[in-house]
Amino acid sequence: MKPLAIPANHGVMGQQEKHSLPADFTKLHLTDSLHPQVTHVSSSHSGCSITSDSGSSSLSDIYQATESEAGDMDLSGLPETAVDSEDDDDEEDIERASDPLMSRDIVRDCLEKDPIDRTDDDIEQLLEFMHQLPAFANMTMSVRRELCAVMVFAVVERAGTIVLNDGEELDSWSVILNGSVEVTYPDGKAEILCMGNSFGVSPTMDKEYMKGVMRTKVDDCQFVCIAQQDYCRILNQVEKNMQKVEEEGEIVMVKEHRELDRTGTRKGHIVIKGTSERLTMHLVEEHSVVDPTFIEDFLLTYRTFLSSPMEVGKKLLEWFNDPSLRDKVTRVVLLWVNNHFNDFEGDPAMTRFLEEFENNLEREKMGGHLRLLNIACAAKAKRRLMTLTKPSREAPLPFILLGGSEKGFGIFVDSVDSGSKATEAGLKRGDQILEVNGQNFENIQLSKAMEILRNNTHLSITVKTNLFVFKELLTRLSEEKRNGAPHLPKIGDIKKASRYSIPDLAVDVEQVIGLEKVNKKSKANTVGGRNKLKKILDKTRISILPQKPYNDIGIGQSQDDSIVGLRQTKHIPTALPVSGTLSSSNPDLLQSHHRILDFSTTPDLPDQVLRVFKADQQSRYIMISKDTTAKEVVIQAIREFAVTATPDQYSLCEVSVTPEGVIKQRRLPDQLSKLADRIQLSGRYYLKNNMETETLCSDEDAQELLRESQISLLQLSTVEVATQLSMRNFELFRNIEPTEYIDDLFKLKSKTSCANLKKFEEVINQETFWVASEILRETNQLKRMKIIKHFIKIALHCRECKNFNSMFAIISGLNLAPVARLRTTWEKLPNKYEKLFQDLQDLFDPSRNMAKYRNVLNSQNLQPPIIPLFPVIKKDLTFLHEGNDSKVDGLVNFEKLRMIAKEIRHVGRMASVNMDPALMFRTRKKKWRSLGSLSQGSTNATVLDVAQTGGHKKRVRRSSFLNAKKLYEDAQMARKVKQYLSNLELEMDEESLQTLSLQCEPATNTLPKNPGDKKPVKSETSPVAPRAGSQQKAQAQPPPPQPQPQHKINQGLQVPAVSLYPSRKKVPVKDLPPFGINSPQALKKILSLSEEGSLERHKKQAEDTISNASSQLSSPPTSPQSSPRKGYTLAPSGTVDNFSDSGHSEISSRSSIVSNSSFDSVPVSLHEERRQRHSVSIVETNLGVGRMERRTMMEPDQYSLGSYAPMAESRGLYATATVISSPSTEELSQDQGDRASLDAADSGRGSWTSCSSGSHDNIQTIQHQRSWETLPFGHTHFDYSGDPAGLWASSSHMDQIMFSDHSTKYNRQNQSRESLEQAQSRASWASSTGYWGEDSEGDTGTIKRRGGKDVSIEAESSSVTSVTTEETKPVPMPAHVAVTSSTAKGLIVRKEGRYREPPPTPPGYIGIPITDFPEGHSHPARKPPDYNVALQRSRMVARPTDTAAPSPIQQPHGHPASGRPVNKPQWHKPNECDPRLAPYQSQGFSTEEDEDEQVSAV
């Protein structure tokens, strides 16, 4: 019997833990908002300031919220500074851009429902969430679905609670959803189970008993439990549902019977596993309603188990000869070409297969299918660029051309000489020539095209396979030969084509595309024809295309019904002759019409503006379209300038100025198009008289041009920068082939080497370092602040563009240690932008597997195009791959491949738009500008409106086009942004960035005030400079005592209890299965435990509701490091930031930076005080226990993190603790300090930067990291010897560090460089150098400078008794305790409600003591780790950290450390004075009556 069914600690588990372990802190964002939150506030709220009842991300809600609630959001109690009032062009957009994309935490809602009440949709939501957990690995989907239907949700509020006792009877199988538990075995060994692990019974009804004692290690542990009876029934039922297919006595395929809903209408058998041959054969077998995506899944994933695609191709050609299989074979080939045309391009064998298959279709007279095949080929073919050289102009061309605008076609290759260079370059019959040497060939006469090709010896040719139109051309030519007269098609004829069959519709579309440009006269008809076609397509979209290709396909559905067309199939009219060959899961076959229409040709509307000059420097604005040629521009310019000459006498010239000041002038060919895109910033178009040799551009004009071409970031519109970033990112994202994900995931060799994927992967690092480079190269502090503000705005607009990738990269760049340490720069940032920045970070809160980001991404209101966060995609795919076996019992595990294919399809849909992304992103920007009011309509719906309704698009655009000059200026701005982005010089070396950072703001040294307390002055490499450095003066540092024994490491290994969902109902005990029936209390264990804190949670429900309202309303921290808000910190703010996040930051726990879990560092007595008092200020002095004075006011956001600092125990570097002042008397007993820290969204400022493909674990640190976290990463070059104060004390900004009991045998003086290196080596993807340290303005606990002035404490204003260094007496303190501060006062009082708060410590994070690392181990490199390395580092380390009661801790005053109760976390132990405070009796507590003041005890 297996008492504990604990899955092996698979590598993937570490991954998953990395993402999901931290509890969800959305509930904890405390605010000053007076607007009550809706009661169903979910954990997925982005924490921003505005929440709409519907949870909708549409901006219509946001607009209203902005006008009502947010109207005072940015202004209440916050005096404007000069920077705040800057009137930028897009300043007004910020309000709207800052509004959050909210969504409910659907998973939590589903879990809290009674299993009987769960709907099919609820089960699908749970299925989607659970399938990523290691406990469910290798289970079939039906088993998972059944388990999701019966699972019960349970929460254990407090750390240290016994869940199961040794010998207790087990009666359920449970999976940890959040937090971690420790099992202590009778022999003393301990094992830690983390998120995704399971424990409990095995699938049998035999009695099983617990071995060992299981305790929760962190607060807010969440579990789902399945009763033993249900678990046994479901797992044993699997065999009954299995259908095994045997051949010659061997099992070749296994199918499973599934029911996808409770109606019984959708049930059947689905392939689970099989041999490669049998899976291939299944392509042409009947597929049940529950397995509609088998063909798509197979075609995407066959490459993982077949060596060559021709193994499938040969079978298909063979089966085509069987009339009964012919239609099915054709459907497979159509889907293959449509979905993965790259399998055919560039592969001669597959190209021959395609040609043979076309011949077979022609032979069998399957014209409709053939047409569809050609459409798919044309739609999916990629543009190819090839370069040909000729020995001389007279040399013959190695190919023959057909077509030309005179026939209504483009230029096509009819034949290519075999063995020629053109053949080697890849030119082949049926290719359409799109461009030669920059000249557009899509609308050109054949004779002119031949002339251009002959007159150039160097040919740069852009071609694209377009067999369909090529065959139309051949048909037309043969008709002309028969009839003797050329036929010029009329585009208007399309209106006669009211047929809705797919092939005919496709023909019409292609006619528009291929024939629209018959001649110049027909251009107007072309536009009209396109509009008519669009109307037809719009009318038929109901029957052919999904109305919302992204939305209706069921985001929340399981893989079984993913986008398989269960809803759409019934809409396809029976009249379609080829309905059997189409899968509605791949509407691309039909969307390709749109794509060809919108991407291959551009609207002929004059949507661009040229500024054309004459020699006398007069200029006119000329409206053109993308395809307008230089000759046409000359004609318009002559008309505009009222010149009375013929167009032949003039030409268009481009004059440009090189950076050296050389003026270049060239005449443009008459047929040159895309003129607006070609002009450089340092160039102008001139109308030149061919008969004159006048100087077009004088030297003065040239100098002006040169000046205009020199641009800096601050000159650029933030909206335009975000637009261009989004366009660039989307183009890269859209070009990723689905097969590249598979090749990359399974490490397969491919022709392209996943080139597109790698490019998209690199972008996030490039953009991250761009941010840092731009900020650190600016030497002027005010400009630096403005650049930071500029980037925050850009990130906000990226969110509007749904460009989460760039948004994340920018936040990462601002969090890079060299940027984060710029304390004085960040202090100048206006308060409004602090809030906006915190909101941005909040969206990427890593808790519960990025729940907020995922909920936003899956929001029903979020329509493509979306640019998702790539590291999350990579992480999800990696988890699916590594969490499931590729082969089971010698058979291919197709269930795994199906899940991976579903995920890739889901990602691909984000790029499935029916319009040019450039047009789409620009439409949003123009709409803002042209409509004036920013609060009309929903921006999220803008894309959809524009994409689906041509009229709306035209209307919006025309409103912008009325002013040619304005349009030109917008286009000029876009050109500036493009040039700026293309010429970026990135500094990718973090060492260099750190050097630049130190040049911007040199590190300051800590000089002791008292002569007797002199300590070695630390060099400027002190890793963390608390942010308050400028306001605090160094205080005396007592001589450190002898190093203390390391045995006190377990002193308080508990994270404060955090009630993540304070306003949520608890599941009644009676409704849940018990963990053990023989427990001492004879209670149903976990469920009853989860009830213990419910009373207190309910008491504070109202306040929590308010506090959840938004982080925008809650005065987020100014700088990258967050600081205590209205609560008072026991430890110096610097240290608080630096370590208090220990549990909540990814690095400290997952990456296992040397923290020993989040210790319960706040003494019991403090907790009790916190319960009774609203705000506590504890000023640490060298004299003794801090005295807490009660503050009389009640403010919901007065939480500061208590008890997160204690990593000092293991680090021996720092011990800190903050006391959280809470709005309710009972609140902290459950919520503990975690809630307090939530607003520390900046805490992510730390190390979540260079996010390459492997950075799925990186995302964790986004919100919860501080400068201190990076401390251990990159500073191996620091010399710690001889510094009693150690790393942290060395900075002049060092704040006081509070608890001596956490000291380890490493005193500060002994903190060796190795210890940092060891920590560094554990770091995950965070900014891999630790520049958080160096002077890092790690002290977010400090006050912001207002208007350039330090907000120091005035005794008169704050009634706080500050303890100055003169008053302090040296008291023996642990070596790691440094009492330093950069202000003369012991307290810093901040007014106006700008509160910083120490970062949160995620429950469930288990840090690793520095002593666990071997000496001398160091990080191999400073670059972000390789993906696999990061994966390995993300694992949780099982240690018996909590098992034994802590040994007494040597206190300076001899007080023993309080031990931890077995069943009750120390945090909650009331009315007991904690001796740990004894050494720090404070002389300086005072009450504050002014509710606008904030005091940080430092």
Swiss-Prot record:
Q: Which Pfam families match?
A: PDZ, RA, RasGEF, RasGEF_N
Name of protein:
Rap guanine nucleotide exchange factor 2
Can you quote a single GO CC term?
endocytic vesicle
Matching PROSITE patterns: CNMP_BINDING_3, PDZ, RA, RASGEF_CAT, RASGEF_NTER
Query: Bias regions of kind Polar residues — which residues?
Result: 1246-1257, 1306-1330
GO BP terms: adenylate cyclase-activating adrenergic receptor signaling pathway; adenylate cyclase-modulating G protein-coupled receptor signaling pathway; blood vessel development; brain-derived neurotrophic factor receptor signaling pathway; cellular response to cAMP; cellular response to cGMP; cellular response to nerve growth factor stimulus; establishment of endothelial barrier
> What UniProt keywords are attached to this protein's entry?
Cell junction, Cell membrane, Cytoplasm, Developmental protein, Differentiation, Endosome, GTPase activation, Guanine-nucleotide releasing factor, Membrane, Neurogenesis, Phosphoprotein, Ubl conjugation
What is said about its interaction partners and assembly?
A: Found in a complex, at least composed of KIDINS220, MAGI2, NTRK1 and RAPGEF2; the complex is mainly formed at late endosomes in a neuronal growth factor (NGF)-dependent manner. Interacts (via C-terminal domain) with NEDD4 (via WW domains); this interaction leads to ubiquitination and degradation via the proteasome pathway in a cAMP-independent manner. Interacts with MAGI1 (via PDZ domain). Interacts with ADRB1 (via C-terminal PDZ motif); the interaction is direct. Interacts (via Ras-associating domain) with RAP1A (via GTP-bound active form).
Native source species: Canis lupus familiaris
| Phosphoserine: residues carrying this PTM | S501, S806, S930, S933, S1022, S1079, S1088, S1094, S1115, S1119, S1158, S1175
The protein's PTM annotation reads: Ubiquitinated by NEDD4, leading to proteasomal degradation. Phosphorylation by PLK2 promotes its activity.
